[in-house]
Structure formats: C-alpha cells, structure tokens
C-alpha cells in the first residue's frame, strides 16, 4: 500500500438513531467507493452479529477504510468508524467519536430528531467534530425535509442550509456525501514525528489469534514487530500482525498519525485491551495517555441460573467466552436456596442484559432463569462504613445501617405533544422529579426528569413506548446518588422466603408492590395438593398475603350410601396426609413468577 499523506486522510463516523438508516448508508458508501464489490455486498455489511441483523441495531463497533477519487483529481482515504446507536453503549460511542474529526448526522426525513441522536450529537460537539447533516429516506411519501431541517436548527443549533438530501436505500445523494466529507471534514493533525500514541476504539476476541485491537494512530508511527505498552492496563505486547480494515483485514508494515487500523499481539482477553486505552511504544513511551479513558461500570445487576443444575459448568464456560469479547460484562458465582447455583451478572443497561441473555441461549444452547434486575445501592452502615450492594439479599439489617442511597438518572424524552400528559404521569409514578420542558418545532416536546435508576431499569422504556404509541424516544445518564427511605421486601411462599424474589423498594410503595406481587404470584404458581400461602413482608411484618387453594381429590367417590364413620375415617386420613404434605412439600415456582417483578403495573 502506498503511503498516504496526512492531508489526504478523512476520519468520520455516522451518528443516527436506531432505524434511521445508518447501516444502509454505510453499505452505499462502501459500494460507491468500490471498497466492497457489488457481488459481495449484503445488507448491513458492517453488522456482523446475527443479533445485530435481526434487531437492526449496531452493537459492536466496526471500521472500514475506503479509497476515494475526488472531483479535484486527488486520491483520498476515508476511514468510516461505525458507532452503536443505543444509550447503553454511549461510552463506546464517545471513544469512536474521539477517533474522528468529523461526523455525518443522519436524520430520518419523515421522523425528525430523536433523543438518542441528540445524546450522540452532544458527544460529537464535545469532541469538536465537524458535523454534516444528512436527511435520509427522502424517497418516502411521508418525508418532510424542510420541517426536519428546521427541527435540527432549533434543537441542535446546526446550520442546515447545506444539508444533504439522501436516500441510502435508493442510492440518492451518495456522491454529494462523499464530496462533502472531503471538503468539510478537517484532515488529522500531522504529528508523525512525535512519540507514538494511539487510541483503542474497539477490540474483539478471535479464537485463533487472541484479541484483535482496532485503533486510530493519534501521534507518531506504529510498525509490525514493535513492542507496545498499553497505558491503562500497563501490559506490554509485541505486534505480530498489523493492517487496515477495508472492511476485511489487509496486512501492512506500518501506520502513521491519522490512520486507522488493527493489530494482534497474542493478547488473551479483551479486558487487557480496554476501549479508550492508549497504545505507546515500550521503549519510547509517551508522557501522558490520551484523555477520556474510563473503565465501563455495570449499572444493572441480575441473577442468571440454569434451569437444569447440570448446566452450571456450561453457563460458566459460556460467560467466560462472552467476557473475552465484552469487557463491560461482570459476573460472580452465587447460590440461591430457591434456584441452586448460578451467577450474579452486571450489565451496562437493560438492552445489554437482554443481548447477553439472548446470546447465551442462542449461541450456547442454555436454558436460563433470570431474576429481576437491581441496581447498585450505597449503604452507610452503623459503623460509618460505605458498602455497595447489588443484591437485595446482602442488604444489612435495618439496625445495622444508617442510610441507603440509590443512583439517580437524568431522563430526557422527546415526544409529540399530545402524549405529554401521559408521559408526565409515568414520570411522577416512577418517583421522578420534574426538571424541564421545552416545546420544539412541529408539535414536539422534550421532557426532562430525574428518576431513580431502579425505576427506569424494570419496564420504563416499554411503558414510555406504549403510552406514546411508539413515538417518544428517550436517553438517560447517571447523575449521582441520593438518600431515600428504602426497604427490602421479602416474598415467602409456603412460609419459606424465596431469595430470588426479594426486591428493594421505596417505603411508600412497598405496600402496593407487595400486594400486587402476591396477587400476581397467586395467578402464576400452579395449585398443589395442599394450601399454599404467599406472603410479602418487610422484616418480620407481613404486609400482604394471598392463598392458593388446594386441589381436592374426592376420596369419597367409592363409598356408596351408608356408613358415616367410614367416610369420616377416609376424610381424616386425607386431612392427615395433607398436613404432612404441607410440612414436607415443596412448591414448584415457574420461571414466569420470577419475571413477575418486572411486569407490575
């Protein structure tokens, strides 16, 4: 490969809400520049996981290098760094934006700006990126490019007079997009002479070569055979394969400032090459790492248990393998009296949790029971120690704790104004604090609430979508911890506490939640030969109870006529048997019961 002057490199990413056509646009750019031959082309070329294709979302980052012959007669190298659009993966988005100098802001011309797009645009503005607005899907009958331009100008404050009208599906506007990338996106700074610093924006595990790291060289040069040091994990490796992604891997000897590529160096796990880490040479180390690195902290926790206890080792192996590819996933073994052995897992958010669960079931053939998700609480004990609790069963007793603090998030919803009332009700019902409301162009409104994360992780998103008929969109970010009167709600079935059903709730909501949960469990647990009591309690005080009546076998069926004492004897024998059964009997609790906590209205 010929060496490219820095002035002829353009690094850009595409920012878009889910479903606004980002992956299709990337496909068209790859085709238009001849990077991928038409015969190799398939839909969503850069989305490699089956799950990404099915859900139509981008989960793992990808990158592609395109050679483009511009109208000014020069050859340019365009590096597209793809970003995931979902709020759970916002840290990955910020890292891939840090590797760029410009971004295409893709907005659906019929839908307008959505909350997720906003969150990512603000990230892009923080990184001082040149933003090029693109209105996609203008071939749709419902497209209103003028209205959407107004909306972008009003909400984001971007000048849209030069916005490109495009339809990725039909291939309209693609040449204009390529030209504007060359004209408007600034080239990287020429820092080839400085000490090597490169930013890792993604890494994945390959079972033959170990971890493959995707990176962007910020300063200096990197060559095959170099010994490099990762500044956050403080580990050193020798590069045995270096190359560029066009989109398939093509080896090269060296890469210099401004270029994007990959390397492998016998790294064992993705944790050792974290997203956002800085690569430098072991011999000539750079003084400071690149700014912005932070380790991904899980926000949502839940228990994963195999339905068949024999699958426990398989579950451990599957989690170990997923962890190689997913540095944000955390897990530790836990035991539950109700469910046996399993794992307590931590995730970035609900989507991340669903994806991990789905991958475990699909790729590793496991059958899982998932307990209700909880968040991390900060508990100050009576000895003035602060401990973090992610499992309701480890909450210290009331006499051993001073206070409990829970994480709060700032939730921003964008909605058509006719749904404002019902979404405000939703915010209030989730202990939300109303912060702000703005009217936007064309009858849309933003609502801002501060809500405890625990209220958001259960079914807030589903509720918001159903109340707004799917039109509202949201994004949230953590703002800190606040003290609240929280209590642990225990559920007892047949006088035995079921640890997997315990939850931490606000004291004022405990009675209602306990009542609703007991009623729900009564519907879901099948009847047994004996009466099954269900109780919800706080400490030793029972606040709600229900009974599942016993199935009654007719023992008198074969007694014709006659002797009452014979019937009495049979009935007493049955009563005795039921009594014994009640003291020894176990109650089967189906999987739906454990998920009931999620679906309390």
UniProtKB/Swiss-Prot annotation:
Gene3D superfamilies reported for this sequence: 3.30.70.240, Elongation factor 4, C-terminal domain, Elongation Factor G (Translational Gtpase), domain 3, P-loop containing nucleotide triphosphate hydrolases, Translation factors
Example of a GO cellular component annotation carried by this entry: plasma membrane
Short name of any one Pfam family annotated for the protein: EFG_C
EC number assigned by the record: 3.6.5.n1
Subcellular location: Cell inner membrane
Binding site for GTP: 19-24, 136-139
Magnesium recorded as keyword: no
Alphabetical UniProt keywords: Cell inner membrane, Cell membrane, GTP-binding, Hydrolase, Membrane, Nucleotide-binding, Protein biosynthesis
Reaction equations catalysed: GTP + H2O = GDP + phosphate + H(+)
Principal cellular location given in the protein's record: membrane
Biological processes, Gene Ontology terms: positive regulation of translation; translation
Membrane-topology descriptor: Peripheral membrane protein
GO molecular function, one term: GTP binding
tr-type G domain sequence ranges: 7-189
Biological role: Required for accurate and efficient protein synthesis under certain stress conditions. May act as a fidelity factor of the translation reaction, by catalyzing a one-codon backward translocation of tRNAs on improperly translocated ribosomes. Back-translocation proceeds from a post-translocation (POST) complex to a pre-translocation (PRE) complex, thus giving elongation factor G a second chance to translocate the tRNAs correctly. Binds to ribosomes in a GTP-dependent manner.
Protein name per UniProt: Elongation factor 4
Source species of the chain: Trichodesmium erythraeum (strain IMS101)
């Amino acid at each position: 490969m010929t060496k490219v002057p820095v002035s002829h490199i353009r690094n850009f990413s595409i920012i878009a809400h889910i479903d606004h056509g980002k992956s299709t646009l990337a496909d068209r750019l790859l085709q238009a520049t001849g990077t991928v031959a038409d015969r190799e082309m398939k839909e969503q070329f850069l989305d490699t996981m089956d799950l990404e294709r099915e859900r139509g979302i981008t989960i793992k980052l990808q990158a592609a290098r395109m050679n483009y012959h511009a109208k000014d007669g020069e050859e340019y190298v365009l590096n597209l760094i793809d970003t995931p659009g979902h709020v759970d993966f916002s840290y990955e988005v910020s890292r891939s934006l840090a590797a760029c100098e410009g971004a295409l802001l893709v907005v659906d011309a019929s839908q307008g700006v959505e909350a997720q797009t906003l969150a990512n645009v603000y990230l892009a503005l923080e990184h001082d990126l040149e933003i090029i607005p693109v209105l996609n899907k203008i071939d749709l009958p419902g497209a209103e490019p003028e209205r959407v331009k107004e909306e972008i100008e009003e909400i984001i404050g971007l000048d849209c007079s030069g916005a490109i009208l495009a339809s990725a599906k039909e291939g309209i506007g693609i040449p204009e997009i390529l030209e504007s990338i060359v004209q408007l996106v600034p080239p990287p700074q020429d820092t080839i002479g400085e000490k090597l610093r490169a930013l890792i924006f993604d890494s994945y595990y390959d079972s033959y070569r170990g971890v493959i790291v995707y990176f962007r060289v910020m300063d200096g040069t990197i060559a095959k055979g170099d010994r490099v040091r990762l500044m956050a994990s403080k580990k050193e490796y020798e590069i045995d394969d270096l190359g560029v992604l066009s989109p398939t891997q093509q080896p090269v000897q060296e890469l210099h400032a401004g270029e994007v590529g990959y390397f492998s160096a016998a790294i064992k796990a993705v944790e050792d090459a974290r997203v956002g880490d800085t690569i430098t040479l072991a011999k000539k180390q750079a003084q400071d790492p690149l700014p912005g690195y932070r380790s991904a902290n899980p926000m949502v926790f839940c228990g994963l248990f195999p339905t068949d206890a024999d699958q426990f080792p398989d579950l451990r192996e599957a989690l170990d393998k997923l962890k190689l590819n997913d540095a944000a996933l955390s897990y530790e073994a836990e035991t539950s009296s109700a469910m046996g052995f399993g794992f307590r897992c931590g995730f970035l958010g609900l989507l991340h949790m669903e994806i991990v669960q789905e991958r475990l079931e699909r790729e590793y053939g496991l059958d899982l029971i998932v307990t209700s998700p909880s968040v991390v609480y900060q508990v100050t004990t009576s000895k003035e120690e602060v401990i973090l609790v992610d499992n309701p069963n480890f909450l210290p007793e009331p006499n051993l704790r001073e206070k409990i603090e829970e994480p709060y998030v700032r939730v921003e919803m964008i909605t058509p104004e006719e749904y404002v009332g019902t979404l405000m009700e939703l915010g209030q019902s989730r202990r939300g604090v109303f912060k702000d409301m703005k009217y936007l162009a064309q009858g849309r409104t933003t609502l801002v609430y501060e809500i405890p994360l625990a209220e958001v992780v259960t079914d807030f998103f589903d509720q918001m979508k159903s109340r707004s008929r799917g039109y509202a969109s949201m994004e949230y970010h953590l703002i800190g911890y606040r003290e609240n009167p929280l209590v642990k709600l225990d559920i007892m079935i047949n006088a035995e506490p079921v640890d997997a059903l315990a939850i931490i709730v606000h004291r004022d909501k405990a009675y209602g939640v306990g009542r609703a949960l007991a009623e729900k469990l009564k519907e879901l647990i099948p009847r047994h030969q004996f009466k099954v009591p269900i109780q919800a309690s706080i400490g030793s005080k029972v606040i709600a109870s229900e009974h599942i009546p016993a199935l009654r076998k007719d023992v008198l069926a074969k007694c014709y006529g006659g002797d009452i004492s014979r019937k009495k004897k049979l009935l007493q024998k049955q009563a005795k048997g039921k009594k014994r059964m009640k003291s020894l009997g176990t109650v089967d609790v189906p999987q739906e019961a454990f998920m009931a906590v999620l679906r309390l209205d």
